[in-house]
């Protein structure tokens, strides 16, 4: 039995969906442990494109069990839409294939309204770049102990009372502070009672089920969302998401004991991207950045927003090693760098003449950073058709090796394209457990 956590090591959009899909082959259980439908995992299987926002991508395998942990915040309407979309493509998501923690908090209509109203009220320089899906306000209610959980839908009287109190408070804020329309109690109540009827068979105790799976020697894969630098505590605050995206939250967000985790795989692009506002030391503003953007199809799966692009940031990578305890890398989009005569990698930062080897916590300092680059030779030939790692150009392998040496973490997986087949597994994290530096 092995338990493996997969996390994004940059600012999200690293290709976690594809890597999770690959590792699902070796898993019995696949678990989402944080975030909501603000994240999108895209994967291509047999030429067919799938985009998942809530359901773990392991649902594509009939013999696998998928779980949504207590750390996830759930929009029932979006979940049902995703299930309906899969059914149209011949895949019915049944309760024996998907379990939702009854401790997961629900995104309510007033959460998205508050999210959008608050973002609209901010000045351009202070906008976070939220997706407007109610993620932040839902987490605020959770921490404020006034949230509504999935299990509350099973008790009609309890749900009615909690909803009444919540709408009374939210309507005051919406109408008085933002001048926005009020939320109608009756329509929300009826809508969520309908959701309860459809989703209640899926509710259960994820923590207990995972412990039973562990004791039965099952392989468990924990699927993270977003990226390390978007972590609410360890990221470039306030330009972050509202949950902990680091590997430690795999345990808190699912009710799984930390001593049972065997390996942590960090997903990292061969270059760097970021969506929305916030510090980005290696960002490229010239034709090179535009080239990476176009060749890498850097547009968000959830929002369609154009991603900012830059060179590989070794400092960010080392931060991810430290914060997650990474045991291996999954390096994606190596193919996008084909054709570059030379490739840069940030090995440190300069802040007003001071050399830094970690992202500073002060946001003004983070925005003032200048990357200190080292340069390595690029390669001319396209690599998207290569299936054997040894067949890669020498320069491409040297680049991978430089990332391994710089971070002290080996590459488990190298990806050279979006399709499942365009992936090379150098070592299986379910079988090999190596310690980081």
Curated annotation (Swiss-Prot):
Q: How are cofactors bound according to the entry's free-text note?
A: Binds 1 Mg(2+) ion per subunit.
Q: Does the keyword Ubl conjugation apply?
A: no
Q: Which GO terms describe its cellular component?
A: cytoplasm
Residues the record lists as binding Mg(2+)? 13, 40
Q: Tell me what gene encodes this.
A: purA
Q: Which Pfam families match?
A: Adenylsucc_synt
InterPro entries named among the record's database cross-references: Adenylosuccin_syn_GTP-bd, Adenylosuccin_syn_Lys_AS, Adenylosuccinate_synth_dom1, Adenylosuccinate_synth_dom2, Adenylosuccinate_synth_dom3, Adenylosuccinate_synthetase, P-loop_NTPase
- Is the keyword Iron-sulfur in the record? no
Give the family per the record.
Belongs to the adenylosuccinate synthetase family.
TM spans (from-to): none
Binding residues for IMP: 13-16, 38-41, 131, 145, 226, 241, 305
Question: Any idea what this protein is called?
Answer: Adenylosuccinate synthetase
* Pathway assigned in UniProt: Purine metabolism; AMP biosynthesis via de novo pathway; AMP from IMP: step 1/2
Q: So what EC number does this one have?
A: 6.3.4.4
State the active site: 13, 41
Question: Could you tell me what reaction this enzyme catalyses?
Answer: IMP + L-aspartate + GTP = N(6)-(1,2-dicarboxyethyl)-AMP + GDP + phosphate + 2 H(+)
Originating species: Desulfotalea psychrophila (strain LSv54 / DSM 12343)
Q: Name one GO molecular function term.
A: magnesium ion binding
Q: Which cofactor does it need?
A: Mg(2+)
Q: What does this protein do?
A: Plays an important role in the de novo pathway of purine nucleotide biosynthesis. Catalyzes the first committed step in the biosynthesis of AMP from IMP.
Location of the protein in the cell: Cytoplasm
Uppermost EC category: ligase
Q: Which SMART domains match?
A: Adenylsucc_synt
